[in-house]
UniProtKB/Swiss-Prot annotation:
It comes from the Bacteria. This is Putative phosphoesterase BH1439. It comes from Halalkalibacterium halodurans (strain ATCC BAA-125 / DSM 18197 / FERM 7344 / JCM 9153 / C-125) (Bacillus halodurans). A motif (HXTX 1) lies at residues 34-37. The active site is at 34 (proton donor), 115 (proton acceptor). Belongs to the 2H phosphoesterase superfamily. YjcG family. Keywords: Hydrolase.
Length: 171
């Protein structure tokens, strides 16, 4: 089965992202807006308990942190994707790095660019038209992230939460 690790932002930020995703993201119905921390990876059922334990350990080792969206950007020419760019933060990078150490395989295709996808698989014309329009908008949002999620993929291609892990040491 396929698994992944992501963080889901607050409802206001998800609503803002979805206002674009419903039109520009063919994966809109498969998963809510999220920040991918670990690309999809395959696990056998007997491997799941040790992975859950490791994700829990990683989450406990990273304190809650600010998530700041500050502009719209694109991965063009690598891919015709539009996204809300997220300001880098050491805790976010730490989570990403830890989720790419043993027992996890390094399966990332690209270097880590914190972002929230709002459009993908766009034609060049769609990308350039929308990028120009969206760059004129003032996109500014900040919130505190205090949890991450282990997800699994259903047979229909959609993703659902397997378990949620609170960041930082429990008091």
């Amino acid at each position: 089965m396929n698994y992944g690790v992501a963080l889901f932002p607050s409802k206001p930020l998800q609503d803002l992202a979805n206002s674009y995703r419903m039109r520009y993201d063919p994966h809109y119905t498969l998963i809510p807006p999220h920040v991918t921390l670990k690309e999809p990876f395959e696990l056998e059922e007997q491997e799941l308990p040790s992975v859950v334990k490791r994700v829990r350990e990683i989450a406990k080792g990273v304190d809650p942190f600010p998530l700041e969206v500050y502009k719209v950007d694109t991965f063009y020419p690598v891919s015709n994707t539009l996204f809300f760019k997220i300001r880098e933060h050491s805790a976010l990078t730490e989570l990403y790095e830890q989720l790419h150490t043993s027992p996890f395989k390094r399966n990332e295709k690209y270097s880590f660019v914190p972002h929230l996808t709002i459009g993908q698989n766009l034609s060049y014309d769609e990308l350039s038209d929308n990028l120009g329009r969206l760059k004129m908008k003032q996109i500014q949002h900040e919130e505190i992230v205090d949890r991450i999620q282990l997800l699994y993929q259903l047979d229909n291609g959609s993703w659902t939460v397997y378990e949620t892990f609170k960041l930082g040491k429990e008091e």
